[in-house]
Every structure is written in C-alpha cells, then in structure tokens.
Amino acid sequence: MERFKKASSIIETLKQQGHEAYFVGGSVRDLIIDRPIGDIDIATSALPEEVMAIFPRHVPVGLEHGTVIVVENGEPYEVTTFRTESEYEDFRRPSSVQFVRSLEEDLKRRDFTMNAIAMTEEGEMVDLFAGQEAIQKREIVTVGNAADRFQEDALRMMRGIRFVSTLGFSLETKTKQAIETYGHLLEHIAIERITVEFEKLLTGTYCVKGLKELVETKLFSHLPYLQMSEERLLKATQYNWDSFETDIEAWAFFLYCIGEEHPSVFLRQWKFSNKKIKDIVAVLLTIRKRKEKDWDTVLLYKTGIHIAEMAERVYEAMIESYDHTSVERVQTLFQALPIKSRQEMDVTGNDLLNWASKKPGPWVAEMIQKIEEAIVQGNVVNEKECIREWLQECNLL
C-alpha cells in the first residue's frame, strides 16, 4: 500500500474540491493478487480542465480521452475523468468519448471484471461487477456481455489470453466461447497492437497455459503467419519456457517451435524494429551453429557475449536441458578471450602500412582480419611487436 499512500494526496485534494476520485485498473487488481504494482492510475469525476486547474504540475497527454498526468511527490500519475464510450468503429475504437460524473458508468466500459475494481484512498474496494470474486476463482470474466465487449474492441480477446499467461488465470466459460465466436474480428486490429499483447503472452510466467488457450479458442488462426500452425503451437506447449530472460529469447524460441523458415519475413509482418529483427535472427543463426558444435573461441568472439548468452538459454530449452551452469560457462569462456572486440587489437591499419612497402588497398582489411583471428585463437600475443614478428614469420609482410 506504500505506493498508493504516496498518490493518495491527489485523491484527497480532488475530494476537497468537491470531486470523486479513486484508484482504478491494473494496480488495484495487482494489489489484491499480491503482485508487483505497476503504474498507479486514478479516475475522477473532475473534468480535465478542472484537474489541470487544481494541480499546477501537470502534463495534458490525452485530453480527448480525459487523461492528465499529475506530478505529485516527484512521481507521475495518470488522472482520467470518468467516461463512457459511444459505438465503436471498426471493432477497435469508440467513435466518441463522453465525460460523466458516475464511477459505475466508467467501470462498466472496462474489459474484465478484475480490471473494473476501484479503491478509495483508505483502501476500501468498490467492486460493482464481482471482480474480487473472479480473482478469487482465478477467472478472467468480461464486464457484462462478452460478445459486446469483444465487438467494441477486438484486441480485448488477445488481452484476455495475455492475462492467462501473465496471471495464470483461466478464461471463464462464456468469455472463452465469445473469443471462439468473434476471433475473426482480430483481423481488424493493427498488428502493432497485437504484437505488444503477444509478446507479453510469450514472456508471461504461465506462457504454456496462454499458448494452449490461443489454440483452444482458435484465435491463433487470425494472426499473421500462424493460420496453419496449430500442431506446432501445441508442440511449443511441451517445452519449459521458464529460463528466458529477454523477449528476444522468447521470440527466437517461439519461431523455432513453429518451424518458421523465414524469420525475418515473419518478424517484418509483425512490424518489429530492424534492431529487434537483427537480434532475433542472430540468436537463431547462432543456435544453428551451436547445434553443430560446442562453443569455441572463434564462434564466441564472432557472436559476442550478448547474443551468445541468449542463444545458449534458447539452445538449452530446445534440447530440454536445465543445466543452469551452461550460460556461466559461456561467460567464463568469453572473459578468457584475449580480446573482446577488434577495437582492443594492439595494431591498426596504419601500423601495417608503415611495416609493409605496399600501397593502401583491400589487403589491409584482410590482414587485420587474419591478425584478429590469430589473436583470438591464441596464435599470437596481442602486442604490437609480437604481431609484427608473427607477420614476418608467416611471410605476411
């Protein structure tokens, strides 16, 4: 409750000005579940302009949706006016937002009952839709009619399965049936929004359970490049996903599980950044080499420790080995390398030009590469004079 206490002065100030105000959303849910608290959000009957007038330190980030960031005790908090939403367009966004003075009207527009619980600054729960009961049963239940909620915003179906993965809850029967019925509406949603939810699914503590629900509800069949992947997705549920430390590893392992032959094409379709695509593909390529042989100095040097650590964790999951010392072994091998990058070489292209009676050309880069490999393999000490002597002995100068 300590973090809520820091924000309670905002609620107290709003109430002193004659407004209602409550803590709402995921932070309240996580408090009840006893999970780490993320962002703390506040809902109020005060209109955005009233909030800004009351709190001088504010940032008007989403006034059309009624949201103002209020800075209190050095921390930013989203303060959003109670609102209701009109008919939705394209199964993804409301055509308009109306500000209201009723907490109930605000809570009834939310996706799941566990996310529709409000809390006073004293810690008293305002639970109008049996959200605490759903949490006790470890069930994900929509607020009101599931068909209505999913037709309003089809991404809620993906969010529901993401919560299965992150919380370990189960989909309530009617909620699950509605996902099976309305899953096709997900095709109206921007892939960027789906990717965010899918990544949270893959990195969730109960990822295997989430993937099973993805298959059972047939929602996977409405996702890019996964339409024909039922058997492969089920294969993915047979592995242990607990050892991954990054989203890069989770995506690399997922692509391995579904047998994706063109990972770059898949990832571009899912709108990943070029940097992320590069890292995921690098992990997959490294695993391919790792399957052929154990780590040696050259492979480890060329791979780099960042990719090597991730590749080793994914490789261990692939072969269903739970030897937690394997990554430590990679780290030890890397630390023992004579150099960690080309920048650490005690020789430059200018040195080579001074030593050799040749004009500049491609031979300089080729020679640097030979020296680099020789240092990494331990054939020459990384000292300028030693390198010069080695070049002369090898008739390379």
From Swiss-Prot:
The residues that hold ATP are: G26, R29, R110, D153, R156, R159, R162
The cofactors named for this UniProt entry are: Mg(2+)
GO MF assignments: ATP binding; CCA tRNA nucleotidyltransferase activity; magnesium ion binding; tRNA binding
Binding of Mg(2+): at which residues?
D39, D41
Which keywords fit this entry according to its UniProt record?
ATP-binding, Magnesium, Metal-binding, Nucleotide-binding, Nucleotidyltransferase, RNA repair, RNA-binding, Transferase, tRNA processing
The domain of life for this entry's organism is: Bacteria
Q: Does the keyword tRNA processing apply?
A: yes
Which reaction is the catalytic activity of this chain?
a tRNA precursor + 2 CTP + ATP = a tRNA with a 3' CCA end + 3 diphosphate; a tRNA with a 3' CCA end + 2 CTP + ATP = a tRNA with a 3' CCACCA end + 3 diphosphate
Sites where the protein binds CTP: G26, R29, R110, D153, R156, R159, R162
The reply to whether Signal figures as a keyword in the UniProt entry is no
A GO BP entry is:
tRNA 3'-terminal CCA addition
The EC number(s) this enzyme carries: 2.7.7.72
Note in the entry: A single active site specifically recognizes both ATP and CTP and is responsible for their addition.
Q: Report the protein's function.
A: Catalyzes the addition and repair of the essential 3'-terminal CCA sequence in tRNAs without using a nucleic acid template. Adds these three nucleotides in the order of C, C, and A to the tRNA nucleotide-73, using CTP and ATP as substrates and producing inorganic pyrophosphate. tRNA 3'-terminal CCA addition is required both for tRNA processing and repair. Also involved in tRNA surveillance by mediating tandem CCA addition to generate a CCACCA at the 3' terminus of unstable tRNAs. While stable tRNAs receive only 3'-terminal CCA, unstable tRNAs are marked with CCACCA and rapidly degraded.
Q: Which family does it belong to?
A: Belongs to the tRNA nucleotidyltransferase/poly(A) polymerase family. Bacterial CCA-adding enzyme type 3 subfamily.
* Assembly and binders: Homodimer.
- Descriptive protein name: CCA-adding enzyme
Organism name: Bacillus anthracis
Q: Which gene encodes it?
A: cca
